[in-house]
A protein has these predicted regions:
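Core sequence-specific DNA-binding domains of diverse transcription factors
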Residues: 1-170
Length: 170
C-alpha cells in the first residue's frame, strides 16, 4: 500500500472488487421542532403534550452529508421507521413494575421498556412516522413520579438489507 488505498491481492480478487468505504456519523436528537431541548418537568400520568407544562416534542434522525459535512435528515419525509426506544429510571434508580413510559406518534401508543439507572439493556420497537426534516412528533406519558431519561436507537441496515452491528443512537 503506497497511496492509502487498501487492495486485496490474494486468490482471484481484483482491485475492482474493493468496496468503497463511506463514513456518515448519525444520531437522534430530541427537539421542539427547531432546537435540541431538555424535556421539561412533567406531571405523573399526564401526557407531555397536555398543559400545564405542555411541550411539542420531536425525535429527529440526523446524519452527516458526506459531500457537504452538514447535518441532514436521515429518513425521508413520510417514512415509517421502527425505532427502538427505552426509558431509564434515574431517581429513584430502579423502576416500579407496571409503570412503563408510553410513547405516542401518529395515534399509536406504545409502552416502552423500563431500565434501571445502572444501564439500558432493554428496548421496545416503536413505529414512528417521520415528516419534514426527518422529525417524528411524539408525546409521552410516565405514570409514576421520578426522574427518567429517554433513549432511542435504530439498527443501521447493511446495503444488502441485513442487520449490521451499527446503531444510530440518541
Amino acid at each position: 500500500v503506497t497511496d492509502g488505498v487498501v487492495t486485496e491481492t490474494s486468490g482471484a480478487a481484483t482491485a475492482g472488487e474493493d468496496a468503497g468505504l463511506i463514513f456518515a456519523p448519525s444520531g437522534f436528537r430530541f427537539t421542539d421542532g427547531t432546537n435540541p431541548v431538555t424535556i421539561g418537568a412533567q406531571i405523573a400520568s399526564k401526557g407531555s403534550n397536555v398543559a400545564p407544562g405542555a411541550q411539542s416534542l420531536y425525535l429527529q434522525a440526523i446524519r452527516t452529508d458526506t459531500s457537504t459535512g452538514a447535518c441532514v435528515g436521515a429518513f425521508p419525509s413520510g417514512s415509517s421507521v421502527n425505532v427502538q426506544m427505552a426509558s431509564q429510571c434515574n431517581n429513584p434508580t430502579t423502576c416500579v413494575a407496571g409503570k412503563q413510559v408510553s410513547i405516542t406518534n401518529n395515534a399509536i401508543t406504545t409502552p416502552i421498556a423500563s431500565n434501571p439507572n445502572a444501564g439500558v439493556g432493554s428496548y421496545t420497537s416503536v413505529p414512528l412516522l417521520f415528516g419534514a426534516n426527518s422529525q417524528a412528533p411524539f408525546s409521552f406519558n410516565y405514570p409514576d413520579a421520578g426522574s427518567i431519561s429517554l433513549h432511542a436507537r435504530y439498527n443501521i441496515p447493511l446495503q444488502g438489507g441485513g442487520a449490521s452491528p451499527d446503531n444510530m443512537l440518541g
